[in-house]
């Protein structure tokens, strides 16, 4: 028995007598106990003898405790354990285990970065910052950029092309969301003809273990998403990404043929698959006309919109404006205007930035659109009227390439059943 060292006290499961000194020893002991708790017929001969020799030097951990410990390990460790055997993979792909893993992962979210380069897309993750100290990023996934829409898991490096949408219409727009009640991921797809309204709506449920397939749903609210030009893939690019908050997917849409000004916000209840909309507030901008473009964000659990605040008749920043939805039924919004402190005001004016979102403490987070000699995040605290710059290390090879940052990334290990036809 190994004494002292790292203790799993944070689990509330082991006393000091189970302390271990090395993560590799922990992983190996879990492997041994996983093998002892489940019968693996393919492990025979010399493999079994080797395992028995190691078992003599280790104490048995109850199987329930082994599973509990596994939920606290990195995704790469889970991927390694899945390869031990078919039965082991079945156990770790079980919905109870994957849901427990996702719940724990959600309590310790990370930062996620993506960088497209030379026809490939690279994903990096990093711990969330506690101060202005530099953060190291870790490469998780590298994959080819393809023309078909797909869902990818940056944690495991897996990706799944979506099945072909059954439609004769030429324009297709999709959004991705999560239902926390039924614990299901869904893709909402809307199709339209070149000059028509988005009249077809289809949903794909992801992660149920069943074959991926589209099914049509009813929409009684005439609308279409606010999209602009086409990407190289041939798909229209939404002016704003959709955002999912507490089981509701929000995206900008033209409701009832309203073509004037800033579009309304469409709401899609992922569980019940019902549509509604929230009227825009007076003063919301569709396009700021400057480097910093408007963005839908999650602000302390509420749908909100960030935009550059520009003075009348000017194209220069006077600050940042935050719109927060207070009452969806009454379409009531609150507006907050923040004047940035110098010299940050000038730096933000001169650098092409994008809004990343707001942190759980209410800080407004921005990042450069492209990686230069350094890459960083800016955290603006409205209460202190101060900006903290957090350097991100490990992305130097992507200088001059586009970058995208995401807050509150939770690792997930759900595996869908592949489609038969793509």
Curated annotation (Swiss-Prot):
Residues 56-103 form the F-box domain. SUPFAM superfamilies: F-box domain (SSF81383). Disulfide bonds: none annotated. SMART domains: FBOX. InterPro entries: F-box-assoc_dom_typ3 (IPR013187), F-box-assoc_interact_dom (IPR017451), F-box-like_dom_sf (IPR036047), F-box_dom (IPR001810). Pfam families: F-box (PF00646), FBA_3 (PF08268). This is Putative F-box protein At1g20657.
């Amino acid at each position: 028995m190994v004494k002292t060292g790292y203790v799993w006290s944070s689990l509330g499961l082991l006393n000091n007598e189970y302390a271990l000194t090395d993560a590799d020893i922990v992983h190996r002991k879990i492997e041994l106990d996983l093998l002892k708790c489940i019968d693996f017929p393919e492990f025979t001969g010399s493999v079994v003898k080797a395992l028995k020799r190691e078992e003599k030097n280790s104490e048995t951990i109850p199987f329930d405790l082994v599973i509990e410990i596994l939920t606290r390990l990195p995704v790469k460790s889970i991927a390694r354990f899945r390869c031990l055997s078919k039965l082991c993979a079945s156990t770790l792909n079980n919905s109870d285990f994957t849901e427990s893993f996702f719940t724990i992962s959600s309590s310790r979210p990370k930062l996620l970065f993506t960088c497209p380069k030379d026809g490939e897309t690279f994903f990096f993750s990093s711990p969330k910052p506690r101060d202005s100290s530099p953060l190291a990023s870790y490469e998780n996934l590298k994959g080819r950029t393809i023309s078909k829409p797909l869902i990818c898991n940056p944690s495991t490096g897996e990706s799944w092309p979506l099945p072909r949408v059954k439609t004769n219409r030429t324009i297709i727009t999709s959004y991705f969301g999560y239902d926390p009640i039924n614990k299901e991921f869904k893709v909402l797809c809307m199709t339209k003809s070149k000059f028509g309204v988005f009249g077809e709506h289809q949903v794909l449920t992801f992660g149920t273990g069943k074959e991926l397939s589209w099914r049509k749903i009813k929409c009684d609210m005439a609308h279409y998403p606010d999209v602009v030009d086409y990407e190289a893939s041939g798909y229209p690019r939404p002016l704003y990404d959709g955002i999912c908050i507490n089981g509701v997917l929000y995206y900008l849409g033209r409701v009832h043929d309203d073509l004037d000004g800033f579009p309304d916000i469409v709401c899609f209840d992922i569980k019940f698959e019902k549509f509604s909309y929230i009227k825009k507030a007076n003063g919301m901008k569709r396009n700021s006309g400057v480097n910093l473009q408007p963005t839908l964000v999650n602000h302390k659990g509420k749908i909100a919109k960030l935009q550059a605040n520009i003075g009348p008749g000017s194209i220069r920043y006077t600050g940042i404006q935050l719109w927060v939805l207070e009452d969806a039924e009454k379409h009531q919004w609150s507006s907050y205007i923040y004047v940035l402190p110098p010299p940050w005001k000038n730096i933000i004016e001169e650098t092409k930035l994008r809004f990343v979102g707001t942190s759980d403490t209410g800080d407004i987070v921005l990042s450069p659109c492209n990686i230069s000699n350094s890459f960083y995040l800016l955290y603006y605290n409205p209460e202190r009227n101060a900006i903290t710059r957090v350097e991100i290390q490990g992305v130097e090879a992507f200088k001059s390439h586009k970058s995208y940052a995401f807050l509150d990334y939770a690792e997930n290990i759900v595996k869908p059943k592949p489609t038969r036809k793509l």
